[in-house]
């Protein structure tokens, strides 16, 4: 098995600072204040902290969803401090994101297949619907969901099943970097363990770099390098 320490760096932060501008009489708020970290390809880095400690903000900055105020953040070879959207856009397909509540990130009016296929359609990966459907079925099987679930709607799945589908969507474009923001905190403990086992298995097979955000040290013990 290849050691991630020998792998190239996927993400590197040096003195990373992210400030939310204050409104009216409120001073600016430093959500992230001068942090340093490195994530190699194939490495899982656990980011632990209380809520409000800037964990999610850091994840959003790596995904290009939040501006960097100071220091340096290099993501897949692109400096995010002052980045132009046109320069970062080609990298977007290479970054997957799993949110805390898959319910809110899925369109309730679309089937699971349509939700999972969304990034494939946005990035024009398949020319025919039948090819896309077959691939989505493969993705669902990869996250241990029956193909028959393709035609179900998000509300017809349990929380754990929705999070599996969310993981399938995040991995649809075969990203080299995955940001998982508290992906199991809304699930029951027994379900949580199963989803984490699956995550661990997929990470070992696919070898994506990952920032795993959580407030739970037990989760980090299980997953992080």
Walk through the language-model features, giving the residues of each.
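Helix-to-loop junction immediately C-terminal to a conserved catalytic motif
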Residues: 63
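A short, proline-enriched helix->beta-strand linker immediately N-terminal to the Walker B motif
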Residues: 172-176
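Hydrophobic anchor residue at the start of the ABC signature
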Residues: 116, 167, 195
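The feature captures the beta-strand-to-loop junction immediately N-terminal to the Walker
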Residues: 48-49
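Conserved ABC ATPase "signature" region
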Residues: 130-148
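Conserved ABC transporter NBD signature motif
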Residues: 71-79, 91
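Conserved ABC ATPase signature
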Residues: 153-157, 161
């Amino acid at each position: 098995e290849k050691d991630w320490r020998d792998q190239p760096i996927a993400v590197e932060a040096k003195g990373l600072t992210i400030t939310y501008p204050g409104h009216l009489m409120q001073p600016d708020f430093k959500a992230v204040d001068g942090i340093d970290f490195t994530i190699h390809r194939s490495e899982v880095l656990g980011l632990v902290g209380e809520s409000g400690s800037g964990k999610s903000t850091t994840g959003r900055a790596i995904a290009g969803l939040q501006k960097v105020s100071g220091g340096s953040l290099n993501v897949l070879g692109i400096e995010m401090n002052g980045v132009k959207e046109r320069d970062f856009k080609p990298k977007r397909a290479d970054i997957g994101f799993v949110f805390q509540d898959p319910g809110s990130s899925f369109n309730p009016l679309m089937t699971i297949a349509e939700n999972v296929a969304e990034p494939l359609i946005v990035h024009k990966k398949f020319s025919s619907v039948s090819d896309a459907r077959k691939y989505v079925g493969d993705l669902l099987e990869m996250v241990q969901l029956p193909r028959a679930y393709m035609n179900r709607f998000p509300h017809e799945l349990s929380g754990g099943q929705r999070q599996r589908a969310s993981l399938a969507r995040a991995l649809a474009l075969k990203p080299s970097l995955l940001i998982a923001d508290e992906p199991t905190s809304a699930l029951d403990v027994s379900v949580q363990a199963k989803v984490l086992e699956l995550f661990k298995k997929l990470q070992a097979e696919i070898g994506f770099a990952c920032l795993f955000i959580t407030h739970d040290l037990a989760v980090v013990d299980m997953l992080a390098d």
